[in-house]
Curated annotation (Swiss-Prot):
Its EC number is 2.3.1.222. Coiled coil: none annotated. Zn(2+) 2 binds at residues 142, 144, 189. The gene is pduL. Zn(2+) 1 binds at residues 33, 35, 94. Keywords: Acyltransferase, Bacterial microcompartment, Metal-binding, Transferase, Zinc. It comes from Sebaldella termitidis (strain ATCC 33386 / NCTC 11300). This is Phosphate propanoyltransferase. Its cofactor is Zn(2+). It is found in: Bacterial microcompartment. One of its GO terms (molecular function) is metal ion binding. It comes from the Bacteria.
Length: 211
């Protein structure tokens, strides 16, 4: 049994124990990754190329791909950056604040999809490159949920809340965005900087903090 399979079993077991009526939800840590537009994907990989899904993500319809890219800033670069599918209307790269400092890109905290006024970067695959003038974000920490979840937890789409995360170093995160959609699966997303701060490990849970 590999690590991915083990983490999936742990997540499912915790969800089973919490049930649909609990106030706690799963917390997931996301590493650096990229969402490519169809145009940029074809430029980097070829006109008729199709990305290769290798792992389903927790949010329905989203997946990690086999293909990787380089992202190149003024002070350095990251190779092996995972592509998440399917393609989006605009290319977006999600880095942590530490990542941004490392490669010389300004770290702008934004909700996913809101990329106006964000920095650009150079993206490479082999001898093919694409330079984007916007799209690099530090993703605002957020909780995905359905309308039913939102009603049960007493929150609404777009609301900013505090969340207590029960990691090995429990802490309360402020400025957490609530994202509500019928297709969403209840879970909180943080990046690796935030994961390290709370002592994240597989099975970490969180809850809305109201005190």
């Amino acid at each position: 049994m590999d690590k991915i399979e083990l983490e999936k079993i742990v997540r499912e077991k915790i969800k089973e124990m919490l049930g649909d009526s609990g106030d706690e939800f799963m917390v997931e840590a996301s590493g650096r990754h990229i969402h490519l537009s169809e145009e940029h994907m074809k430029h980097l990989f070829g006109e008729d190329y199709k990305l290769t899904p290798v792992k389903d993500l927790s949010q329905p319809g989203q997946y990690a791909c086999k293909e990787r890219v380089r992202v190149i800033g003024s002070k350095g670069e990251f190779s092996g950056v995972v592509i998440l599918g399917p393609c989006r209307n605009e290319t977006q790269i999600e880095l942590s604040l530490t990542d941004c400092t490392t490669i010389g890109v300004k770290g702008v905290i934004r909700e996913s999809g809101k990329i106006e006024g964000t920095p650009g970067i150079l993206i490479g695959v082999g001898d093919k490159f694409v330079k984007i003038d916007k799209g690099v974000i530090v993703a605002q920490r957020h909780v995905h949920m359905t309308p039913e979840d939102a009603g049960r937890l007493g929150v609404k789409d777009g609301e900013i809340v505090k969340v207590r995360v029960n990691g090995r170093r429990p802490l309360i995160f402020d400025d957490v965005l609530i994202r509500v959609k019928d297709s969403y699966k209840l879970s909180m997303h943080i990046d690796y900087d935030e994961a390290n701060a709370c002592g994240f490990e597989s099975g970490t849970t969180g809850s809305i903090y109201r005190k």
